[in-house]
Amino acid sequence: MAEVKQESLSGITEGEAKEFHKIFTSSILVFFGVAAFAHLLVWIWRPWVPGPNGYSALETLTQTLTYLS
């Protein structure tokens, strides 16, 4: 009898699938790393969770900048 060769639904070989998976996982890790770094920079610039005094610290900064200009 003839041996039945299993073929994937996508039509790519196992080696090609492993290569694609390697590139995909490294790309997604780089994307998440850049996104986390961007969120960190935005957090340093303007935190989205208020401190113990609320956003009053930002009001003082606004008044100071208005006075200086």
Curated annotation (Swiss-Prot):
Pfam families membership: LHC
Organism: Rhodospirillum rubrum (strain ATCC 11170 / ATH 1.1.1 / DSM 467 / LMG 4362 / NCIMB 8255 / S1)
Primary localization class, coarse: membrane
Gene3D superfamilies listed in its UniProt record: 1.20.5.250
Record's function text: Antenna complexes are light-harvesting systems, which transfer the excitation energy to the reaction centers.
Record-stated family: Belongs to the antenna complex beta subunit family.
Transmembrane parts of this sequence: 23-45
GO molecular function, one term: electron transporter, transferring electrons within the cyclic electron transport pathway of photosynthesis activity
Cited NCBIfam families: pufB_517_ASD
GO cellular component, one term: plasma membrane
Annotated keywords: Antenna complex, Bacteriochlorophyll, Cell inner membrane, Cell membrane, Chlorophyll, Chromophore, Light-harvesting polypeptide, Magnesium, Membrane, Metal-binding, Transmembrane, Transmembrane helix
UniProt subcellular location: Cell inner membrane
Periplasmic side: 46-56
Domain of life: Bacteria
Annotated signal peptide: none
Bilayer topology annotation: Single-pass type II membrane protein
InterPro entries recorded: Antenna_a/b (IPR000066), Antenna_beta_CS (IPR023623), Antenna_beta_dom_sf (IPR023624), LHB-1/5 (IPR002362), Light-harvesting_complex (IPR035889)
Listed name of the protein: Light-harvesting protein B-870 beta chain
Topological domains, Cytoplasmic: 3-22
One of the GO BP terms on file: photosynthesis, light reaction
